[in-house]
């Protein structure tokens, strides 16, 4: 079982904690991580792109000249795709790009991401995070105590509005619960700060 230091929010060490081996101690699967990132990024696409076909463009689309006798190529409509102002053929239409990977694959990706944080020594486990009032300075002081000056992801076991509101003004800090954990946030933040309860909960949920 991977063993990491258990810290107070001021950065002082209070001992060690053993993490669930099947969640925090596996060999990261880079292929599955890639698949999960592609899936999540696809789900973020708006998919609102659209063009007008020949039935939707402005104008009546009358026949420009008679069928025979002019010596020119026959034309059926001034809104045919080859005409200026005509419709577009096979253009993009609004669609959803989102799709789902199997649940087992998604969980393996999360376990791989968490294990890679342990391997990189980028995981900090706190006894708990306690803030009396929602103030940005409180989170700043916690990060200073932990000597974290990079992008940080804070993971809680339950939603705590005081902590969330305290971090709202910090561009490089994101606060999530265990249920909200996702691949992009795990990989895009340099440091993962997780409470003891959240680490234990993740060990149960993702095992």
Swiss-Prot record:
Compositional bias of kind Basic residues: 60-71
Gene Ontology CC annotations of this record: ribonucleoprotein complex; ribosome
Keyword RNA-binding belongs to the record: yes
Entry keywords, A to Z: Ribonucleoprotein, Ribosomal protein, RNA-binding, rRNA-binding
InterPro entries: Ribosomal_uL4, Ribosomal_uL4-like, Ribosomal_uL4_dom_sf
GO BP annotation list: translation
Keyword Cell cycle: no
GO molecular function terms listed in the Swiss-Prot or TrEMBL record: rRNA binding; structural constituent of ribosome
Region of interest (Disordered), ranges: 45-80
SUPFAM superfamilies according to UniProt: Ribosomal protein L4
NCBIfam families referenced in this protein's UniProt entry, alphabetically: rplD_bact
Family affiliation: Belongs to the universal ribosomal protein uL4 family.
Quaternary structure (record): Part of the 50S ribosomal subunit.
Function: One of the primary rRNA binding proteins, this protein initially binds near the 5'-end of the 23S rRNA. It is important during the early stages of 50S assembly. It makes multiple contacts with different domains of the 23S rRNA in the assembled 50S subunit and ribosome. Forms part of the polypeptide exit tunnel.
Protein name: Large ribosomal subunit protein uL4
Species of provenance: Oceanobacillus iheyensis (strain DSM 14371 / CIP 107618 / JCM 11309 / KCTC 3954 / HTE831)
Gene it is expressed from: rplD
């Amino acid at each position: 079982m991977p063993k990491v230091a258990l810290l107070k929010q001021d950065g002082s060490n209070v001992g060690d904690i053993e993490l669930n081996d099947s969640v925090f101690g596996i060999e990261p699967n880079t292929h599955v991580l890639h698949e999960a990132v592609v899936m999540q990024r696809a789900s973020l696409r708006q998919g609102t792109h659209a063009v007008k076909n020949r039935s939707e463009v402005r104008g009546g689309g009358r026949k420009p000249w008679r069928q025979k006798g002019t010596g020119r190529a026959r034309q059926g409509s001034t809104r045919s795709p080859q005409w200026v102002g005509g419709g577009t053929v096979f253009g993009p239409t609004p669609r959803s790009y989102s799709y789902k990977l199997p649940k087992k694959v998604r969980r393996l990706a999360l376990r791989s991401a968490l294990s890679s944080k342990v391997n990189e020594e980028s995981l900090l486990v706190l006894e708990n995070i306690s803030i009396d009032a929602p103030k940005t300075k409180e989170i700043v002081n916690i990060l200073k105590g932990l000597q974290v000056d990079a992008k940080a992801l804070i993971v809680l076991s339950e939603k705590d509005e005081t902590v969330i509101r305290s971090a709202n003004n910090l561009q490089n800090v994101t606060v999530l619960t265990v249920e909200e954990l996702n691949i992009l946030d795990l990989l895009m933040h340099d440091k993962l700060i997780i409470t003891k309860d959240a680490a234990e909960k993740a060990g149960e949920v993702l095992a």
